Curated annotation (Swiss-Prot):
Belongs to the NifH/BchL/ChlL family. It catalyses: N2 + 8 reduced [2Fe-2S]-[ferredoxin] + 16 ATP + 16 H2O = H2 + 8 oxidized [2Fe-2S]-[ferredoxin] + 2 NH4(+) + 16 ADP + 16 phosphate + 6 H(+). The lineage of its organism: Archaea, Methanobacteriati, Methanobacteriota, Methanomada group, Methanobacteria. This is Nitrogenase iron protein 2. The keyword Oxidoreductase applies. ATP binds at G8, K9, G10, G11, I12, G13, K14, S15. It comes from Methanothermobacter thermautotrophicus (strain ATCC 29096 / DSM 1053 / JCM 10044 / NBRC 100330 / Delta H). Keywords: 4Fe-4S, ADP-ribosylation, ATP-binding, Iron, Iron-sulfur, Metal-binding, Nitrogen fixation, Nucleotide-binding, Oxidoreductase. It is an enzyme of class 1 (oxidoreductase). The modification ADP-ribosylarginine is found at R94. Gene3D superfamilies: P-loop containing nucleotide triphosphate hydrolases (3.40.50.300).
Length: 265
């Protein structure tokens, strides 16, 4: 079983990448996607609408069965959303802890699954959001970032969390926002933390068009160049055998790194 965790700053596009990777894998593999973000929107484009979260289900039934928490979407992809508390109430990562405990109790990870993908909020790699790594639910990690300051800042913090948890970083994914020298910036960042750029996803209007219909690009525009990018990324990650324990930059190193590109630009 291939067990992949995708981390990144909130709003960076993790869910889009995860859902399209899952759709790409579904043609040849049995896939489970677990959304570990309080927004609970990872699987919307796979299932066609928002799912009830594990926390929502548990409010109604303390002993749910598998069919209440796992829903089958596009290509047979099995979808789960951990959920989170109402804004301002409780720990945002609590849903991940509760969801993982329930899924394990229900024997989900013993089923006939080839690929598990976790979509994890990574502004802070602590508490519940560290569960996929800390509790050994995921074998490899990928960081999604753009070339923007705050996204890279979060990515560096994620690298710090991965190192602390002794996780295996498989690479950095550039989800492009269209800024100057973006792929070069992210590639250099990946190198600085002892990793590599494993893929770059260009900005495309097809993403928004697909998401307006609650579908992935793979489903809505299967012959598009954008769909090909997602398929290649999925394949490169599936075949990846190069992993490192990252070496995050300290604050001064990070500021110098980012300033270098702004000065050169």
């Amino acid at each position: 079983m291939k067990r992949i965790a995708i981390y990144g700053k909130g709003g960076i596009g993790k869910s889009t990448i995860v859902s399209n990777m899952a759709a790409a894998y579904s043609s040849e593999h049995r896939v489970l996607v677990i959304g570990c973000d309080p927004k609970a929107d990872t699987t919307r484009t796979l299932y066609g609408e928002r799912l009830p979260t594990v926390l929502d289900v548990l409010k109604e039934n303390r002993e749910p069965d598998v069919s209440e928490v796992i829903h089958t979407g596009f290509g047979g992809v099995r979808c789960v959303e951990s959920g989170g508390p109402e804004p301002g109430v409780g720990c945002a990562g609590r849903g991940v802890i509760v969801a993982m405990n329930l899924l394990e109790r229900l024997g989900v990870f013993r089923e006939d699954i080839d690929v598990v993908i976790y979509d994890v909020l990574g502004d802070v790699v602590c508490g519940g959001f560290a569960v996929p790594l800390r509790e050994d639910f995921a074998d490899e990690v990928y960081i999604v970032t753009s070339g923007e300051y705050m996204s890279l800042y979060a990515a560096n913090n994620i690298a710090r969390g991965i190192r602390k948890l002794k996780g295996k970083l498989g690479g950095v994914i550039c989800n492009c926002r269209g800024i100057r020298d973006e792929v070069e910036i992210v590639s250099e960042f990946a190198s600085r933390i002892g990793s590599r750029l494993i893929g770059a996803v260009p900005r495309s209007n097809l993403v928004q068009e697909s998401e307006l219909e609650a579908r992935t690009v793979i489903e809505r525009f299967p012959e598009s160049e954008q769909a090909s990018v997602y398929r290649k990324l999925a394949e490169d990650i599936y075949r990846n055998t190069e992993f490192t324990v990252p070496e995050p930059m300290d604050q001064e190193e990070f500021e110098e790194f980012f300033r270098k590109f702004r000065v050169e630009g």
